[in-house]
């Protein structure tokens, strides 16, 4: 079965990778794209997309009603991703969203919308399979190492901090680790924020520098030993195998799934 796909933000770095993914996948069809510019034009007329025939829409609702795609891929920004996820579900399109910034209330509202309309949705803080495995391994380790800190490193154009992956990792660890304050009980910061932000007592540190793509290490400490679990995305192509899996899986869902780990076998 051919899956008809709309991609939001095709000119962005992640959007370009998503377009390339659809083009090289036999059972995927690029039905249209949503962009801030070039309404009514064709993607093939834009630099870097020669030969890729897809109408461009600036209005998501008009795109969904006229094109009637099966799936929306949105790897843009938190604000845009939230808006597109809700619109897609309201118009019978299955959203696959790779942006962060969704609150528990957002997830609850979108889950209700997906179940009301009996269609699937997938939201994942990270589509890199290696990153998902890192989170799984961190959760396993937290049963035995209760002292832990997270360091996430991203390019300097990332809009949110900490990353959705870091927050998701902390949430998974907190499920199996008793809440505790780490470090010396009388510890004081001589510079505000020196110990990072904290989720349920787990310090999270965010680094933003040119040259990075997406990286995270989870450092556990115990008596006489440490354990570090690290994942590095060296190229944005690292996310595409997870996007492909999500697009294929969402066609068979009737609810929202948050996190790629829930669809990995």
From Swiss-Prot:
Family annotation (Pfam families): DapB_C (PF05173), DapB_N (PF01113)
Chain sites annotated for binding NAD(+): 9-14, 98-100, 124-127
Signal peptide (from-to): none
Alphabetic keyword roster: Amino-acid biosynthesis, Cytoplasm, Diaminopimelate biosynthesis, Lysine biosynthesis, NAD, NADP, Oxidoreductase
Subcellular localization(s) per the UniProt record: Cytoplasm
Gene Ontology annotations for the cellular component aspect, listed alphabetically: cytosol
Any coiled-coil regions, as ranges: none
Binding-site residues, (S)-2,3,4,5-tetrahydrodipicolinate: 155, 164-165
Pathway where it operates: Amino-acid biosynthesis; L-lysine biosynthesis via DAP pathway; (S)-tetrahydrodipicolinate from L-aspartate: step 4/4
GO biological process per UniProt: diaminopimelate biosynthetic process; lysine biosynthetic process via diaminopimelate
Annotated EC: 1.17.1.8
InterPro entries hit by this protein: DapB_C, DapB_N, DapB_N_CS, DHDPR_bac, NAD(P)-bd_dom_sf
Stored SUPFAM superfamilies: Glyceraldehyde-3-phosphate dehydrogenase-like, C-terminal domain, NAD(P)-binding Rossmann-fold domains
Residues binding NADP(+): 37
Functional note: Catalyzes the conversion of 4-hydroxy-tetrahydrodipicolinate (HTPA) to tetrahydrodipicolinate.
NCBIfam families tied to this protein: dapB (TIGR00036)
Family assignment from sequence similarity: Belongs to the DapB family.
Identification of the protein by name: 4-hydroxy-tetrahydrodipicolinate reductase
Species of provenance: Geobacillus thermodenitrificans (strain NG80-2)
Lineage: Bacteria, Bacillati, Bacillota, Bacilli, Bacillales
Gene name as annotated: dapB
